């Protein structure tokens, strides 16, 4: 009897595949069920964000950052307003720094909750996804109460934040911080020691520390490979230098470690949120310079100068001194950065966005070689990609 030949063929994975997490199109070259090459095709969600920003004032450019990684939105705004503030040479009030730090961590939990539970869902576990969405709903309510929007917040502004926290909000966030670890315990009970889950993700998509650095990994994907690099510790911004927290680090660099690092990061985020609430100082939430931030409504009703400031701010925007600056933050997915070039006018000359997901997606081929087709799905879930920021 003639021995059967393993047939090599090419298949399209996505862009409308439920496990593709958006509009990912993968061209998979297969030998039987084994992947020889995974070629990601990006650009299906390209909206020309960087070019649009060049035609907008700095204030009008901020909302575009919500639409990049649309899972935890305020973190992206943070990188842009930090870069703008560096160019302006201003220091924002301490209360605004605490509010930003608090909402950065809420964004981190929003992101990890979706990723961890969707990752478990990708490999066959449905229940955690329902738990995760219930908690995300509560967090989005905190977004809504502070700025009126559940997702596209546009809350951080150059010079501080858009508005102060409403009465009673901090108490409600503190109450949520007490109940949330129990939900994490429930998710971990279902997944962490689950035999089926571990068989799907342990030793799948292993990335060594050297490979992680060579490919430019950042964030949880880098830490899962055993490198304790976190911008909140190494280059602290706002009030992270006043916060006590640990950096969870994996040791195998596989899908399971990436999952564990994110779960532990959520626990650390709750710690940071509690400290922000406990230490939250009083005072203003925006710089008092009306050349940069709008005057109070009450002043505009009585003062002609305030009205002029307001009109100038929202028609031509504030002028930013010429120069270039790189502003980076530790976003939930990794190092999100903005390279901002100003030519001294009210609009950015160039705004290069450095998304973490773009780098991680490049490594998908390296991670999936020699694995089965079903493991590609597990790899996509474990590196946490969102196409808003990859395609921009």
Curated annotation (Swiss-Prot):
UniProt GO molecular function: NAD binding; NADH:ubiquinone reductase (non-electrogenic) activity; quinone binding
Entry EC no(s): 7.1.1.-
Membrane topology qualifier: Peripheral membrane protein
Catalytic activity: a quinone + NADH + 5 H(+)(in) = a quinol + NAD(+) + 4 H(+)(out)
Keyword Cell membrane: yes
Keywords (A to Z) from UniProt: Cell inner membrane, Cell membrane, Membrane, NAD, Quinone, Translocase, Transport, Ubiquinone
Pfam families: Complex1_49kDa
Keyword match Transcription regulation: no
Enzyme class: translocase
One GO cellular component term: plasma membrane
Coiled-coil ranges per UniProt: none
Disulphide connectivity of cysteines: none
Compartments it resides in: Cell inner membrane
PANTHER family cross-referenced by the UniProt entry: NADH DEHYDROGENASE [UBIQUINONE] IRON-SULFUR PROTEIN 2, MITOCHONDRIAL (PTHR11993:SF10), NADH-UBIQUINONE OXIDOREDUCTASE 49 KDA SUBUNIT (PTHR11993)
HAMAP family named in the record: NDH1_NuoD
Family: Belongs to the complex I 49 kDa subunit family.
Subunit structure: NDH-1 is composed of 14 different subunits. Subunits NuoB, C, D, E, F, and G constitute the peripheral sector of the complex.
NCBIfam families the record matches: NuoD, PRK06075.1
Function statement: NDH-1 shuttles electrons from NADH, via FMN and iron-sulfur (Fe-S) centers, to quinones in the respiratory chain. The immediate electron acceptor for the enzyme in this species is believed to be ubiquinone. Couples the redox reaction to proton translocation (for every two electrons transferred, four hydrogen ions are translocated across the cytoplasmic membrane), and thus conserves the redox energy in a proton gradient.
Name of the protein: NADH-quinone oxidoreductase subunit D
